[in-house]
Amino acid sequence: MKLLTVAFSLLLLGQVHASPLVLDKRSSCQLGDVWDLNAADAACSASCAIQHGDKHGGHCDKNKVCVCN
């Protein structure tokens, strides 16, 4: 029973830890596209530079998900 509880806890922790990354990839493109400023790609590029010091560019794909180059 304890093994099942530990396994379930690790699975749940893994899902919680993985979720913010997807949300963050979408949020930079969506927030950059507010008020028709067309700054989504710039926000994505800045997000890539902050998160990955070695990646200095990025763009938003057709699903508004940030793709770091």
Swiss-Prot record:
GO cellular component assignments: extracellular region; membrane; other organism cell membrane
Organism encoding this protein: Aspergillus oryzae (strain ATCC 42149 / RIB 40)
Alphabetical keyword list: Antibiotic, Antimicrobial, Cleavage on pair of basic residues, Defensin, Disulfide bond, Immunity, Innate immunity, Lipid-binding, Membrane, Secreted, Signal, Target cell membrane, Target membrane
UniProt record, GO biological process: defense response to bacterium; humoral immune response
Domain of life: Eukaryota
Main location, first listed in the record: secreted
Signal peptide stretch: 1-18
Name by which UniProt lists this protein: Fungal defensin oryzeasin
Family in the record: Belongs to the invertebrate defensin family.
Function: Shows antibacterial activity against numerous Gram-positive bacteria. It selectively inhibits peptidoglycan biosynthesis through complex formation with the cell wall precursor lipid II (1:1 molar ratio) thus inhibiting cell wall synthesis.
Propiece span(s): 19-26
Lineage of origin: Eukaryota, Fungi, Dikarya, Ascomycota, Pezizomycotina
Localization per record: Secreted; Target cell membrane
Disulfide feature: 29-60, 44-66, 48-68
InterPro entries, per the entry: Scorpion_toxin-like_sf
GO MF term (any one): lipid binding
